[in-house]
Amino acid sequence: MKRIFGIFIFLSLLLFLVPLLASCTKEKQVYIVYFGEHKGDKAFHEIEAHHHSYLQSVKETEEDATSSLLYRRASSINGFAAELTPDQASRLKELKEVVSVFKSDPRKYKIHTTRSWEFVGLKEEEGEDYRSDGDAPRHKYDVNDRFRVGRKFLKNAKHGDGVIVGLIDSGVWPESRSFDDKGMGPIPESWKGICQTGVAFNSSHCNRKIIGARYYARGYERYYGPFNAEANKDFLSPRDADGHGSHTASTAVGRRVDGVSALGGIAMGTASGGASLARLAVYKACWAVPNKEKYATNTCFDEDMLAAFDDAIADGVNVISISIGTVEPHTYLEDGIAIGALHAVKRDIVVAASAGNDGPARETLSNPAPWIITVGASSLDRFFVGRLELGDGYVFESDSLTTLKMDNYAPLVYAPDVVVPGVSRNDAMLCLPNALSPDHVRGKVVLCLRGYGSGSTIGKGLEVKRAGGVGMILANSRDNDAFDVESHFVPTALVFSSTVDRILDYIYNTYEPVAFIKPAETVLYRNQPEDSVYPFSSRAPNWVDANILKPDIIAPGLNILAAWSGADSASKDSIDRRVLDYNLDSGTSMSCPHVAGAIALLKSMHPTWSSAAIRSALMTTASMTNEDNEPIQDYDGSPANPFALGSRHFRPTKAASPGLVYDASYQSYLLYCCSVGLTNLDPTFKCPSRIPPGYNLNYPSISIPYLSGTVTVTRTVTCVGRTGNSTSVYVFNAQPPNGVLVKAEPNVLVFDKIGQKKRFNIIFTTQRYEFTGEARRDRYRFGWFSWTDGHHVVRSSIAVSLV
């Protein structure tokens, strides 16, 4: 009887679940349907009709087809975005001419979140000596000479005047002084864009600096529902409510603004973009997630970003900067940024994108497509330092932005020891809201742990303040991880986890432990490596195709001072009410616009250079050493390798005259795509019967996975600069990876005119090598090769793994 009853229950559940499962398979989601490149034989309205016919072929009614459509792109990008069931998407994928169909996902992308331009040699006015207490600068060369070279470069590049930089991000705060158009000339005649109005944004917010602005929210609203200003904490317009877009825009092309600083006067100085006279076109495609804290999350949809790319191309931008990337790896045909960038590059628009903030783990980088300039993050020679002093005389130098002062030494306690009754010690250890007992915290310094997913660091400081504390020591969860250095509400010292043991030992073995936290100071040339790769910067190998070495380059991304949104606080935390005009932020999001600004300058100097030529110039002239002429270090003090820094740290002034460039056309990228199985991107291009390997794309670096025996790699260089009227003779040199013999045929290249091309082979051969420890067979090893004529050094990174 029990068995019969069990069968009855099972059948009942089955009958209930079958319709439910069936309904799930019919659930609509937004998909992007991509057709590759246009054939060129259809008018705009014919392309739209063509798209509609495909959509209607899987829809039951005309009304359903029309209502499901979000975007229909026909100017540069060939495709549409629509609500589809999984079955409808699958049917479309099988149709002729459809290149890819992929699902939109709000969790797919995330935003990758002064002194920095001086650091790379671009300073407009006469520079200071940067001497401290009369001591000579510790650099091994004349800093002012570097600034003179930088000023000449800026003058020759006309500060980017005439170049239009498109920024796909969270919008712009147009009232910022960084976007003032005073003294700027007429808008370039090549500009075809618009100034789209919306909430708190009208046509008067565009000017001769912000020459255009648009916003894209159809994908966002289709997923989250109609826009609700209170829940969304955003503006349905190009106006920036986050700060990220304004920050990246002003870093790339902001005007020179004197006397700016972060909260408390930290980083006081001049804020300026790299190309201060370049024009800005804003494409807002990223938004706050409803009812979520801005510091914790944001979202950008494929369909919205592809629409932004399509408009930017049609509007006439010269450069696109996009500090956004996927959370998880995706193939090129499932990555809206890769697709949009390929169409941009076809029209010689240079695209720079951030590498991501998921380092230091391997295979974490975003934007790995070879037609994108992928930018990692380095530190600066400027630090914000506070001092933590314990009662036993022990002193810690601490990262800090807090300028608040303690009156004197105060009792020191560990957060779990001052917990509110009934609250877990873990919550107290993380200094979560209402976890600390005012009776035991009042007048004391509290040691808290940072944790992950445990609330904002600003919130921890507020909890200490709520409980009456006078200072906070915030310890990281693991050594060498990056700190978000923020301006807290109580005097705060940030320490690594290795320091915690020393502090706890003092607390528990001292009768009355005390601590004193000194306010933060701005320090230049601190006694630690500058120009190093920061731990959050994402790393190779390139999981989409290991034949392409990424990132391409690194640029400053730590504590960058730039414009901010007046609708957001310093920390992006809703409990933080402090509003400011300029803010410090860190991430590869900040590195990317540095390179975008440099690209704008190079575009101004060399308007006929292709996107690939500009990338090559930046990569092959990058610096191998830091300011002390020592190899650039990784976050842990070890020498950084190309998986972390690509071709190393960018030097815009050197990139202006690279000598030789590795050029690549749109056709070159299509041929490369054949090697990764993408054979139908362009109906006018057919893959050859013998497809060359991916490492033969004419790229300024070389990556060979699984080298066995001998591999020959082919490259072509183009002469873009000569010394005088004489013939230029370039000689090959190499530092080969361990266990690999590297030689070039020919090993001398002779050029007698600008524009001349020379082809050469580089032959890689494995040698007898003992693989032990870190040099196991599955490990990559690194090197470089160069061509030099005595004036130019054209250097390329090498990454090889042996089998």
Swiss-Prot record:
PROSITE patterns: SUBTILASE, SUBTILASE_SER. It is found in: Secreted. Gene3D superfamilies: 2.60.40.2310, 3.50.30.30, Peptidase S8 propeptide/proteinase inhibitor I9, Peptidase S8/S53 domain. Its EC number is 3.4.21.-. It is an enzyme of class 3 (hydrolase). Its main location: secreted. Glycans are attached at N202, N725. Residues 1-22 form the signal peptide. The active site is at D169 (charge relay system), H244 (charge relay system), S589 (charge relay system). Residues 23-112 form a propeptide. Pfam families: fn3_6, Inhibitor_I9, PA, Peptidase_S8. Keywords: Autocatalytic cleavage, Glycoprotein, Hydrolase, Protease, Secreted, Serine protease, Signal, Zymogen. One of its GO terms (molecular function) is serine-type endopeptidase activity. Belongs to the peptidase S8 family. This is Subtilisin-like protease SBT5.5. It comes from Arabidopsis thaliana (Mouse-ear cress). The gene is SBT5.5.
